[in-house]
Amino acid sequence: MSNGAFDAIFEYAWGQIDKPISGDFIYGKDLPKLIEIIENIFQKAQKSGSYELRLPLFSEINKDLFRTFSNTKTFFKIHKEEFDDIFFNLVNHPLREILENAFIGVDSIPSDFIVSMNLNSPSKFLVENKSKNTEGAGISTPRKKLTESPIKLLSRNNIGKALEVQVEELKRELTAKQSLLQENERQVSELKIRLETYQEKYASIQQRFSDLQKARQVEDNQNSSRTSDPGSPLVTGIDQKAILEEFRRRLQRQTDTISFLKDQIRRERGLNCSNDKVSHSKRKHATTDGDGTFKNFISAVPSNIWVKATIRIIVCFALLAGVLPYIRKYVYAHDTPSQNSRLQLSWWENSGILSKIVWFFEDQTDLETEYRSNANVDDAYSRVFGI
């Protein structure tokens, strides 16, 4: 590995930026320019065709890092002995390794690369040594300084003014950074105070929580000891009062239900019996009246006349029964139906004897039906309540 070739390339690029008048450093804003000078050297070597190179040397990401560094640290002084560390922190690779890997088929920078690219021009240190040697030999005299041209003096004055401007900018930047540091320190102190306050509150809350937890545990232990004792008054009170009260409440509810059902059944039975008695008495009264009249009529008429009259009545009744439908059909054929047509009585309802006979059998049937239904209700009630 040729360290001399790398040093020559680095010294050449450094000398293009670091002029003897500015000192042994470059500013952060000059870092992209230094990288560009090194890339131009390798691009010229590739164009000449003397060497096979891997270009570009630096990726776009690395170039963005260089530009960001130059923008954020514009007037940061990069000394030559600190350059390797700063460069490695930016791209995570040393500059020497990047330049040596650029040559294809060679592990290091060829020694004749410097000669082919004409990089043997005197660097800053050679210029400084030459100036020192000439001063030691007595070549330069105060008279020469007096005879310097006004253009050189003006250029030196411009450089001095530029340096003064840079110094002022650096002072302003330093003042801004100091104020920023003071503000950060103030915020840090406030945050420390708030942190201490929150720590005290947290300790207080934690203490209260532990006290409440202990009190709750003691209370639970006391309750468990009370409930675990079978002879305790609490357990006795629950067994005697709560259970008996629940039984009483259920028994009262069943008693009320039974009383309500009994009253309802009694009311239904009383209503049916009263209706049956009223209807039966009315019909019986009508029947007795008719029977009395019929008996008086029979006793007043002789037996032979009664037999003839009975035969004649039966014959007449048969004739009327056969002719009556035709007469009714003829009489009511052209009548329009009215709303009261449904209320007209049947032909047997107009006869007192026939209506009494039919009503008697219907009443007997209804009474038997009601008796059976009431008996079924009583049986169901007895089965439900166990009576």
Curated annotation (Swiss-Prot):
Membrane topology: Single-pass membrane protein
Role noted for this protein: Component of the spindle pole body (SPB) required for insertion of the nascent SPB into the nuclear envelope and for the proper execution of spindle pole body (SPB) duplication.
Quaternary organization: Interacts with BBP1, MPS3, and SPC24.
Domain of life of the native organism: Eukaryota
Protein name: Monopolar spindle protein 2
Chain segments annotated as transmembrane: 311-327
InterPro entries xrefs: Mps2
